[in-house]
């Protein structure tokens, strides 16, 4: 199962952490993992194309995206990513788990 942890502060995304494997199919054939990876990579690349200092990310066994600048464009792209993850989870709820923390 892919596990996603989203941290917000006053509605702004501070970080997104992801780990695990969807387990929908064998490695290399898993459409859930392929979709999830595509969404993550596309979002990271779009943000870095606009401003290479807007986020930091690590991609080992656990992916973590940290929103450094928290500007409108970066936050909009990260919110779009979260919305896409929820949409994917709605179709594959046995393969994706999402937790959100919001600090005011």
Protein language model annotation of sequence segments:
Residues 1-32, 38-41, 45-104:
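N-terminal intrinsically disordered, cationic/polar leader segments
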């Amino acid at each position: 199962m892919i596990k996603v942890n989203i941290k917000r502060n006053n509605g702004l995304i501070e970080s997104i952490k992801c780990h695990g494997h969807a387990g929908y199919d064998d490695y290399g054939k898993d459409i859930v993992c392929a979709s999830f990876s595509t969404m993550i990579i596309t979002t990271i690349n779009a943000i870095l194309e606009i401003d290479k200092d807007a986020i930091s990310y690590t991609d080992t066994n656990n992916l973590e995206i940290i929103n450094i600048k928290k500007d409108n464009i970066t936050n909009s792209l990260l919110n779009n990513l979260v919305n896409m993850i929820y949409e994917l989870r709605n179709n594959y709820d046995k393969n994706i788990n999402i937790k959100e923390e919001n600090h005011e």
